[in-house]
């Protein structure tokens, strides 16, 4: 702990003098101005474009944002769910809204019923509401995959008070394949160690920096006790979790969670409804739920990134915006490779 404290102090001091300026990470607000592209049709690396619907459905992004803002203001937990929904969609079959498909006679086990998604994944009703509004305004124009991407961006903006607001390229098409087994194969569980996490992200074209930055989304939302109790995180003799947090969690979680008895707990007890860099301070203080969270201190590279994100104002929000756009470009379907669903829950 003494060595970690020294590392924290040293890196914070170094960054305040040199590296933040050298990397162009100022202390200003990276919000809606923020240096990100203006909403005009600007190509992105995945064949997508910022402002994709400017001509075909000029109010598309405003419609989605209005629905998301209303939902998140009523229940901040839905915002956390929408951010997670984008991650869980993109890591399976790419960012193609495959996670939204309901079970059918032909496909009884789609992604949304896979253990990593059911019953914890949420926000589906917000996507439905946005799709209904868009179909009324611009029938058959805006894909469900783009709605998921816009909703993840807009939830980030609301929960961060505008500090993580950014342009989101669009032009995705919706996929027709959804498999529960694929979700199990590609979604990294909270029990993963650092090498497993790194490999999982690399398989989707994301690097270690993306891993550290996107893990920061655990600063909002709740988790089922079953996501960490079985990994020994509450074992006082073996876990590196802060004993005070572990004791609190033991009072909230059953020793052996079941489907009928699996409460949820806050992922960040300090600022639970705010998308901010508090997560990284929690990691340093060992006030995190998952093995995958604690794993960020297991290498010098990731530990240094945790320290910088924790102590440099505005740095994480800028990184998060870029990482979200990168993640939302995973294996996208464009043109004839997909469709634009009329109903996000079923293929056309």
Locate each region found by the language model.
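Catalytic cores of secreted/periplasmic or lumenal enzymes
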Residues: 2-348
């Amino acid at each position: 702990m003494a060595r970690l404290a020294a590392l924290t102090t040293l890196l914070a001091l170094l960054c305040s003098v040199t590296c933040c300026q050298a990397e162009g990470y100022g202390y200003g607000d990276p919000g809606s101005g923020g240096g990100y592209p203006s909403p005009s049709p600007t190509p992105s690396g995945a064949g997508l474009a910022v402002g994709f619907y400017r001509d075909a459905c000029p109010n598309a992004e405003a419609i989605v944002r209005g629905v998301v803002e209303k939902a998140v203001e009523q229940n901040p937990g839905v915002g956390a769910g929408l951010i997670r929904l984008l991650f869980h969609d993109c890591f399976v079959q790419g960012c193609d809204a495959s996670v939204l498909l309901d079970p059918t006679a032909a496909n009884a086990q789609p992604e949304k019923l896979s253990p990593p998604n059911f019953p914890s994944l949420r926000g589906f009703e917000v996507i439905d509401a946005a799709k209904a509004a868009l179909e009324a305004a611009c029938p058959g124009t805006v894909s469900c995959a783009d709605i998921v991407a816009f909703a993840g961006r807009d939830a980030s903006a609301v929960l961060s008070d505008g500090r993580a607001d950014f342009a989101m390229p669009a032009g995705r098409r919706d996929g027709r394949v959804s498999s529960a087994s694929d979700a199990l194969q590609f979604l990294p569980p909270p029990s993963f160690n650092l090498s497993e996490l790194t490999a999982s992200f690399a398989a989707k074209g994301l690097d270690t920096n993306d891993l550290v930055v996107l893990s920061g989304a655990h600063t909002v939302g709740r988790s089922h006790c079953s996501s960490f109790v079985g990994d020994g995180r509450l074992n006082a003799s073996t876990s590196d979790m802060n004993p005070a947090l572990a004791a609190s969690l033991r009072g909230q979680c059953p020793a052996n969670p079941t489907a009928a008895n699996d409460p949820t707990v806050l992922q960040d007890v300090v600022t639970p409804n705010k998308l901010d860099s508090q997560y990284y301070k929690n990691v340093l203080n060992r006030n995190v739920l998952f093995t995958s969270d604690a794993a960020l201190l297991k290498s010098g590279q990731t530990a240094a990134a945790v320290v910088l994100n924790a102590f440099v104002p505005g740095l994480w929000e800028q990184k998060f915006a870029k990482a979200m756009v990168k993640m939302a470009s995973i294996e996208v379907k464009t043109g004839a490779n997909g469709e634009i669903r009329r109903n996000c829950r079923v293929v056309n």
